[in-house]
A protein has these predicted regions:
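Non-transmembrane, amphipathic alpha-helical segments
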Residues: 72, 112-126, 182-185, 217-220
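Extended intrinsically disordered or low-complexity regions, especially N/C-terminal cytosolic tails and loops
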Residues: 1-121, 249-261
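Surface-exposed polar/charged interaction patches
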Residues: 40, 44, 83, 87-97, ...
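Flexible secondary-structure boundary motifs
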Residues: 137-215, 234-239
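Amphipathic, Lys/Arg-enriched alpha-helical patches that create a basic surface
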Residues: 199, 211-261
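Amphipathic alpha-helix face/heptad-repeat signature
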Residues: 80, 123, 130, 186-189, ...
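Short, hydrophobic, well-ordered secondary-structure elements
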Residues: 120-144
Length: 261
């Protein structure tokens, strides 16, 4: 699985090279404003654009060691999704290690290593939470701030769930519905993802036994991460084509545990 591309929050394709721009057409008032900006430590609240060879991307300024830097604003949807994929990169390896190196009931002799469990579940939780964040950040970006959420009885919803946003609100805004037709099969996986994420965030030990977290651990071991990653990509790209793309560099990057020498 190749690593996903990171993308800017906004970009505009251009059919000219930035070197072709004529400085003489810039109004004097704009030149004065630009000079004042460059010589002050005040950060801009206006749009800042970075001109590249084939496109313009939006960014923001940041003071670092008395220097005003211009940084590209990366779309958080692509950050969260990349985090999820990179967390998954070594997940199957550590799952296999955990299951093959653990003690078998009725047998003795295996050394118990908490790191085998810890490493797998760290990456598993990271992947789940970032996949959910991918969906929720996409919903929050798509839905206008002033949008009024209404339930099926016509009453206002004060705190809509992410499921309501994904399955009720976005289809109304986009006039297309991911739950219809051939995409239906992905919804069950997305529902399971959201439920598992909620179980993790609101984790509370079961009171019936002294191993209060075994339920969530079993669910994480059983969860189909690869299908969930594909389902989230399908959902996002259904509404915003090609927002989630694999990089063409051919390299696979993954988060891993590293022993400092």
């Amino acid at each position: 699985m190749g690593h996903p591309k990171l993308k800017a929050t906004r970009e505009i394709k251009i059919d000219f090279h930035p070197s072709e721009l004529d400085d003489t057409i810039v109004p004097e008032e704009s030149k004065v404003k630009a000079k004042d900006y460059l010589t002050s430590k005040k950060l801009a609240e206006d749009d800042i654009m970075l001109m590249l060879d084939t496109k313009v991307i939006y960014g923001y300024d940041y003071l670092y060691k008395d220097k005003k830097l211009i940084l590209p604003e990366v779309n958080p949807i692509t950050i969260f999704y990349a985090n999820a994929v990179m967390s998954y990169g070594r997940l199957e390896h550590y799952k296999k290690t955990l299951l093959t190196e653990s003690s078998e009931a009725g047998k003795v002799g295996k050394v118990v290593n908490l790191n085998h469990s810890g490493t797998f579940f760290q990456l598993a939780v990271n992947s789940i939470i970032n996949l959910q964040a991918t969906l929720e950040s996409f919903a929050n970006r798509t839905i206008p701030k002033e949008y009024e959420f209404i339930d099926k009885f016509g009453k206002t919803i004060i705190n809509p769930t992410v499921t309501h946003k994904l399955y009720n609100t976005i289809p109304k805004i986009k006039n297309i519905d991911f739950k219809q037709g051939k995409y239906k099969k992905y919804n069950k996986c997305i529902d399971s993802l959201i439920q598992l994420r909620n179980d993790i965030i609101h984790l509370k030990p079961a009171e019936k036994t002294n191993t209060g977290y075994k339920g969530i651990y079993r669910n994480l071991l059983d969860f189909d991460f690869q299908k969930a990653i594909a389902s989230v990509k399908m959902f996002i790209n259904f509404y915003e084509p090609d927002l989630i793309e694999e990089c063409t560099c051919g390299q696979n990057f993954a988060f891993d545990t590293v022993l400092n020498q």
